[in-house]
Amino acid sequence: DMNWLSFKGKAGLRCEYFNYNSFLYTGSDELYTVKPEGFFSYFASAHLETLDRRYFPNRGVSLEADYSLYTDNFVKYNGSSPFSAIGLKFMTVCPISSRLSLLPAFYGRVLIGGNTAFPFLNAIGGETFGRYLSQQLPFAGINHVEILDNSVVVARLQLRQRIAGNNYITLTGNYGIHNNDFFHLLEGKSLWGGSLGYAYN
């Protein structure tokens, strides 16, 4: 790890084991082959953050980029080339008044390679990053985990109102698009969603 002012950097090696054997339920179009597998992955990430607080910030920017290379023997995966993933997250707070803020965000993940293992497929759902899977992206309107194609991008806009001290109401709208081919992403499938939430800080 490296920390310098508002910048954080990390790089290293991960060892993970997934004891997948079967699914309790799969849809007719969700045909995934799973088995217990171990992985060695190399990773690097950089994070620039100027948000004034961790929860319900009033101002600032968060920009994070990460890259991971996945293998099962430090060099290859399943006897061939390893696969990798690139992720990007951006969020900023635009105060409209002392109580009302606009929070635009943009994030996505791209898988590179044609031999991706199930535990690292792109997934969205829920309100926070990494809710059930480390690579899971939030998406208002989907409360479960949804597996998507190899390239996914989400644009989100939140309107947050502070009421009566530390009470907050947030209106969220988001749009996502996904495709197996990043270079034809705009020809992919679209997702729309939204939510209205309350929170106390």
Which residues are covered by each model-predicted region?
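Secondary-structure boundary/capping motif
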Residues: 98-100, 167, 198-200
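Extended hydrophobic-aromatic, low-complexity segments
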Residues: 150, 165-171, 180-184
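Short, loop-centered acidic/histidine patches that primarily coordinate divalent metals
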Residues: 162, 172-176, 197-201
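C-terminal beta-signal and terminal closure region of outer-membrane beta-barrel proteins
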Residues: 186-201
